[in-house]
Every structure is written in C-alpha cells, then in structure tokens.
Amino acid sequence: MKNVFLTGIFLVIAQLCFSQSFDKHAHRGGKSLYPENTIPAMKNALKMNITTLEMDLAITKDKKVILSHDAFLSPELVTKPDGTYIPKDSGFYYKIYDMPYAKIQTFDVGLKKLDNYPDQKKMKAQKPLFSDIIDTCEAYSRELKRPLPFYNIETKTRPFSDHIFHPEPKEFVDLMMKIIVKKGIQERVIIQSFDPRTLEIIHKEYPRIMTALLVEKVDDKKLAQQQFHFKNIPAVKFKQYPDHLNGVAGDLKFLSFIPPIYSPDHTLVTLQLVQECHALGMKVIPWTVNTKERLKELKDMGIDGVISDDPRIFE
C-alpha cells in the first residue's frame, strides 16, 4: 500500500511539473531546422527554449538503443559510406535490427538534401545512442542555464513487426528503461507509442513513468499498404492498435488504463475530442503541427501542448 501511495505521489508531482505551461515538443528534435533525431537537432531545440524533446528509439542487432524514426536506413535520409545513396526500393534491406551499431555509424544521416525541409541545415551526422543523447542534452541544458528538458520517447514497435524490425515489446522496454533509470530522468520522461503493448508494460512494471497513447486514423487504404509490406503476417496483427475508427472511447479499449496523455494526429482534433479527453483526466498533445495558424486553432480548442517539426512556430 505504501508503494502504491508513493507511486501516486510521484506521478502527481511529475504531472504538475509537466503541466506548468503549454508543452512545446520538438518533433525528432525539430527536423525542419536540423537533421532529425540527431545531437545537433536536440541541442538546437534546447537553445530555442523547447519544453520537451521528442524522439524515436530503435534497437540494433547488438542490442544498442539508438535514435531512429525508421526501422531501416531510409533512402530519403541516408548517405552510404562511399557517398552514394540507398536506392529507393531497397530501404528494407538495411534493417536496423539486423545491423550492429558500429556498421550503422558508417552511414550519414545529415548530408542529403530534403526537398520537404528546405531550411534544414546540412552537416555530417550519425544516428546517436540514446544514452549519448541524454548525457549531451542534460549537460547542454546546464551550460545554457535552462531547466532540464522533458523527453518524449516513442517506442517504435508494432504487433506485425516483432522479430522483423524490433524485439518483442518486453525486451524493447527493458533495454530502454535500463538507460532511463541509470540516467535518473524518470520524472522527466514520457513514453509514447502506437503500440498499446509497450504502454501496458510501462504501466505495470514502471508505474512512475508517464505514458502517451499515439493515435492515427487507419482506414482500409492504410491497412492495405501495411499488409502489402508484411505479406506473411496474419491479418489480425494489423488491427491490434488504435485506429480512431470508434473515437477516443474506441482507442482506449486497447488499454487497461487511462494514460495521462492522448496524442492524436492533429487532423483528428476537435473541441469535442479535447473536452472528452479532459473529462477523463487526459492531456491532449497532437502531432505534427507545423504552422502558427494551425497551432492557434488547436490552442483555441484547449489542447495542452503540441508536437512540431518547426520550433519557430512557438516564437
């Protein structure tokens, strides 16, 4: 009983600290300005007074926890060691889960020009270790004499890609949490996921950690695309995570608890959705909002924070 009480107090304190002001998340460190999920991106976000650093985690063949949105070396972002690019149709060949970290480090993720992000600075960069990101961001915040940041960390798992792109959720969570606990940042961490399995593990085994349910609308077209890429996976595995086809209530049926944060695609947000989430005790932090006009519309609906590629919208 005492442990349950202390855990509750811990969560209340963490949420109070988290809720002092509108929560500004730099998506992948703010990919509009710097190469995504890299140390330079995170440091720039800290300089711009971002509240929370949003990032994605992947697991390598040798069980290193690294930052990567994609489960493979993306043809859109990556330059090979010889200076050439990965062919567009062969991205899945370079699966992170099949590669040791030392090999991944030989590929560059900061030099290739991205047409969708013309303001992104080009520089040599590699996919960093999660532990190095924490060490760097903690030290840089102190150097800037700024409050230590929150970390919004996505577990990049899906029921249909276990043992293909990542280990099973339990192993993924344990590898990640070992680093979080070692670095002592539990009170400033949010674990977000589209995969309810990882959130359930966090809730049951690491109850002090805040969680966020990521939500997107999965229609028949999107479902067909997923099934095309994973032809040998049973169809039922593609329907084991929230699809928003039945609203907030339908999404929450995938969990045994109500998470502190509901994080939908911003196009799904309505005044009614925000009010429904607030009535359930959930904050609403949508993704990915990249214009000041859309930010104002969402703030007028009462959202609690936002995830953006472009930290300049908060200026």
For each predicted feature, which ranges?
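Phosphate-group recognition and catalysis centered on beta-loop-alpha active-site segments
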Residues: 19-315
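Bacterial Sec-dependent N-terminal signal peptides
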Residues: 1-22
